[in-house]
């Protein structure tokens, strides 16, 4: 059919029967080429297109809970390395006796000696000895401003007073510091800071130097009274 005749048939200028469209003709189903003989070397059981191939049947017994637990046990079970239960003896070194026959090491029990307190005592020196300037010193730890009267009475009697205000709130501690400063000024004494929230009130006849205040702070004397 010529191109002109196809054009006329497309626009209805000629009968439709005379129009033969090769695109409307249904092609014949392609025939599957014959499978060659099993001489290609392929495994016929691996060819899924083969009619002889069949999927293996699903077996519920293989996935039963008991069977699954058996399979898990095969992989979960692990035998760790075995260690010998025999206990090896450990050599114990005995302490060497010193030249005086005493065993080296710290002494425990009733015979123990607190060397730290001895060092503290040695650092105090004559400052706190009997007859020293601070031999009558007293430490007061007020909990509120109501104890200011006790501090004033001790200081009025000529006793040096250490005020430990650590346990007081900041507001009450500030009020007590103002009271002590005014008290020291009125009685011609001195009012000095020893440590954080710790102060020393000294009467007029007792002069405490800066070095002595430093020694009070180092020895922690105010915390032992």
Swiss-Prot record:
GO cellular component, as recorded: cytoplasm
Keyword Oxidoreductase: no
Gene Ontology BP, a term: FtsZ-dependent cytokinesis
Principal subcellular localization: cytoplasm
Biased composition range(s): Basic and acidic residues: 28-54, 77-86
Keywords noted in UniProt: Cell cycle, Cell division, Cytoplasm, Septation
Keyword Cell division found: yes
Alphabetized Pfam families for the sequence: SepF
InterPro entries on file: Cell_div_SepF, Cell_div_SepF/SepF-rel, SepF-like_sf
Compartment(s) of residence: Cytoplasm
Region described as Disordered: spans on this chain: 22-116
Family, per entry: Belongs to the SepF family.
Job description of the protein: Cell division protein that is part of the divisome complex and is recruited early to the Z-ring. Probably stimulates Z-ring formation, perhaps through the cross-linking of FtsZ protofilaments. Its function overlaps with FtsA.
Record-linked HAMAP family: SepF
Subunit description: Homodimer. Interacts with FtsZ.
Stated name of the protein: Cell division protein SepF
Gene: sepF
């Amino acid at each position: 059919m010529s191109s002109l005749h196809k054009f006329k048939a497309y626009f209805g200028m000629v009968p439709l029967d005379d129009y033969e469209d090769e695109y409307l003709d249904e092609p014949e189903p392609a025939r599957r080429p014959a499978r060659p003989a099993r001489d290609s070397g392929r495994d016929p059981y691996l060819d899924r297109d083969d009619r002889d191939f069949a999927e293996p049947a699903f077996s519920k017994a293989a996935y039963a809970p008991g069977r699954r637990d058996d399979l898990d046990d095969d992989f979960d079970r692990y035998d760790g390395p075995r260690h010998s239960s025999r206990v090896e003896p450990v050599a114990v070194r005995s302490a060497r006796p010193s030249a005086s026959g005493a065993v080296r090491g710290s002494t425990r029990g009733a015979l123990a000696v607190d060397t730290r307190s001895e060092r503290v005592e040695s650092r105090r020196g004559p400052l706190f000895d009997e007859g020293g300037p601070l031999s009558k010193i007293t430490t007061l730890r007020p909990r509120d401003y109501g104890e200011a009267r006790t501090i004033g009475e001790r200081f009025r009697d000529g006793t040096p007073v250490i005020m430990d205000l650590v346990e007081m709130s900041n507001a009450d501690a500030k009020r007590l510091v103002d009271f002590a400063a005014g008290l020291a000024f009125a009685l011609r004494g001195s009012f000095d800071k020893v440590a954080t929230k710790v102060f020393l009130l000294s009467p007029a006849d007792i002069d405490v130097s800066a070095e002595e205040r430093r020694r009070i702070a180092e020895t922690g004397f105010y915390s032992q009274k």
